[in-house]
């Protein structure tokens, strides 16, 4: 039994230590290269290490610390049952945004951010239902009953909606947080999240203002290798959070089952006590009856002798 417990603990540790990033990984990915110095945003000064050949170099020691902090915060958010929306529509990010969001079972936006995707969520859900309705018509025989022109119109509408909404088709409620690549390009997404008090995790380059970002990850947001490295790390954080969420749920179920059993045992013991009391009362009554009968008998015997 002890061996099984040790094995279970080892497996949990493997899950929780599955993702690590070191300074060398960030350097190899080119995460330290910022923008030209003339394009910098002064608000990023705390995260800049130096200037070299007209380019700002990001302080990767700070980046690593903030990246690990963001990782832990994302684990915590997901472990509480929260969901993450991954956002990255630039060419360098869209492929890995989609693949990593799928890997960790989260929603994503990799084509175009529709205005109101968060702040006007009910309208977005209507568009999703429209897409699902067209897809249903394709399979239920409706397409066979309409004209070729109508079919062409619906097919084009479906393709357009699918391209934009595919990543959020299963998003039935607002996300618990969003992860963004390039906050300058995705400024509408950031503004909508801020308006709704939704935490924002983001890769922030030297040409951006980090004011509206809850968890800043200073890094080169144009290099494919850097984007891939950080997004995969955040997806690992989601997976770790999901494992902790499942573990917590399992513990809650076990606690409820244990409480139910204890309550059942207490009820049985209480019932046994009641039965025992009834039995004792009956026994006492029987003894009283016997005693009374004996008294009556003793009282009658002398009179019969006289």
Which residues fall in each region the model found?
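Intrinsically disordered, compositionally biased charged tails
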Residues: 1-20, 240-306
């Amino acid at each position: 039994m002890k061996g099984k417990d040790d094995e279970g603990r080892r497996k949990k540790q493997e899950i929780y230590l599955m993702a690590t990033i070191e300074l060398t990984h960030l350097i190899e990915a080119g995460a330290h290269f910022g923008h030209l110095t003339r394009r910098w945003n002064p608000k990023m000064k705390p995260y800049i290490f130096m200037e070299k050949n007209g380019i700002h170099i990001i302080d990767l020691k700070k980046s690593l610390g903030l990246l690990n902090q963001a990782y832990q915060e994302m684990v915590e958010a997901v472990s509480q049952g929260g969901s993450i929306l991954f956002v990255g529509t630039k060419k360098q990010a869209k492929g890995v945004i989609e693949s990593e969001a799928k890997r960790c079972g989260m929603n994503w936006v990799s084509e175009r951010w529709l205005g109101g995707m968060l702040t006007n969520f009910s309208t977005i859900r209507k568009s999703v239902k429209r897409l699902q309705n067209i897809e249903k018509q394709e399979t239920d025989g409706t397409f066979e009953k309409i004209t070729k022109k109508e079919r062409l119109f619906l097919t084009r509408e479906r393709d357009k909606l699918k391209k934009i909404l595919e990543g959020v088709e299963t998003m039935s409620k607002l996300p618990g947080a969003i992860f963004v690549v390039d906050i300058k390009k995705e400024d509408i997404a950031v503004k909508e999240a801020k308006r709704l008090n939704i935490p924002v995790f983001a890769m922030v380059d030297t040409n951006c203002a980090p004011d509206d970002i809850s968890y800043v990850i200073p890094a080169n947001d144009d290099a494919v290798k850097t984007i891939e490295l950080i997004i995969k790390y955040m997806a690992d954080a989601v997976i770790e959070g999901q494992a902790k969420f499942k573990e917590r749920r399992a513990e809650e179920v076990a606690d409820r089952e244990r409480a139910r059993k204890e309550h059942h045992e207490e009820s049985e013991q209480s019932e046994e006590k009641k039965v025992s009391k009834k039995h004792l009362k009956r026994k006492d009554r029987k003894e009283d009856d016997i005693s009374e009968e004996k008294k009556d008998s003793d009282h009658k015997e002398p009179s019969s002798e006289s």
